[in-house]
């Protein structure tokens, strides 16, 4: 299996969870030192696991990386598209360039990797796990650029799951809420409005994803109660928007 953004956070936690169950796991990321630390933990359980330093923002290099990873892993049967960046700014402070660069990393990159590996995944009856976000469903304040990338990834996943109906490929979308990762401390971002939401540890992601792989669940929320919140939003989107405006004003 291949986990992008595997040098820290959710990607590292998922990779370690899979390796602990005996899977051969490949991880990729930009920080070689962090990759080495995670790989050492993976190889304690799964000695054939490996890592690659790669910048998935380089869209033109993704196809070559996919071929390399596929060959060196002996075939990818589970692809976890986890790599991504935050971009917390109000729309008044966004530029087209910032929006496009965020979309490139969070949307176009996983799409290119998926398409490159799709023949192998179909051949191996594999799984595609796209790490989206609760932001794709709830559109939090100051997250327009980021939320749009995740909403695009979720919509892609829905259509892809139907398009692959005559294969045995499983498609899964995971919507984490607030997970204790670097995402909320990265520079060049406005402060996140998360004071009222409990941050979960990264390993809280492992069991829900493993269950989805086992039972075929398409969409997973972590924590689960955000499913009910999302359903409430879709029952009355206008009320949700007005309530979110009031919440944002209280934090201004």
Where would I find each of the regions flagged by the language model?
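C-terminal helical subdomain
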Residues: 173, 189-229
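The beta1-alpha1 cofactor-binding region of Rossmann-like NAD(H)/NADP(H)-dependent oxidoreductases
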Residues: 32-33, 53-65, 96
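Substrate-binding pocket helix/loop in short-chain dehydrogenase/reductase
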Residues: 90-91, 95-100
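Active-site helix of classical SDR
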Residues: 114, 149
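Conserved glycine-rich Rossmann-like NAD(P)H-binding loop of the short-chain dehydrogenase/reductase
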Residues: 21-38
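Conserved glycine-rich cofactor-binding loop
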Residues: 5-8
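Residue(s) in the substrate-gating loop at a strand-loop-helix junction
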Residues: 133
């Amino acid at each position: 299996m291949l986990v992008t953004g595997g040098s820290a956070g959710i990607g590292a936690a998922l990779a370690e969870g899979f390796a602990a169950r005996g899977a051969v796991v490949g991880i990729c990321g930009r920080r070689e030192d962090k990759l080495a630390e995670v790989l050492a933990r993976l190889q304690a359980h799964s000695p054939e696991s490996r890592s690659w330093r790669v910048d998935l923002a380089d869209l033109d290099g993704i196809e070559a990386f996919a071929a390399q990873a596929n060959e060196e892993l002996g075939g990818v049967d589970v692809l976890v598209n986890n790599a991504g960046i935050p971009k917390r700014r109000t729309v008044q402070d966004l530029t087209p360039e910032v929006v496009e660069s965020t979309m490139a990393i969070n949307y176009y990159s996983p799409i290119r990797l998926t398409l490159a590996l799709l023949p192998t995944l179909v051949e191996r009856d594999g799984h595609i796990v796209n790490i989206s976000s609760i932001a794709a469903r709830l559109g939090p304040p100051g997250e327009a650029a980021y939320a749009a990338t995740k909403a695009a990834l979720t919509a892609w996943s829905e259509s892809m799951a139907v398009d692959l109906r005559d294969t045995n490929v499983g498609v899964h979308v995971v919507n984490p809420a607030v997970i204790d990762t670097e995402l909320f401390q990265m520079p060049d971002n406005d402060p996140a409005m998360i004071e009222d939401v409990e941050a979960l540890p990264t390993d809280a992601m492992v069991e829900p994803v493993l269950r989805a792989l086992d039972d075929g669940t398409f969409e997973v929320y972590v924590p689960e109660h955000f499913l009910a919140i999302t359903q409430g939003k879709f029952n009355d989107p206008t009320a949700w928007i007005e309530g979110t405006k009031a919440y944002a004003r209280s934090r201004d």
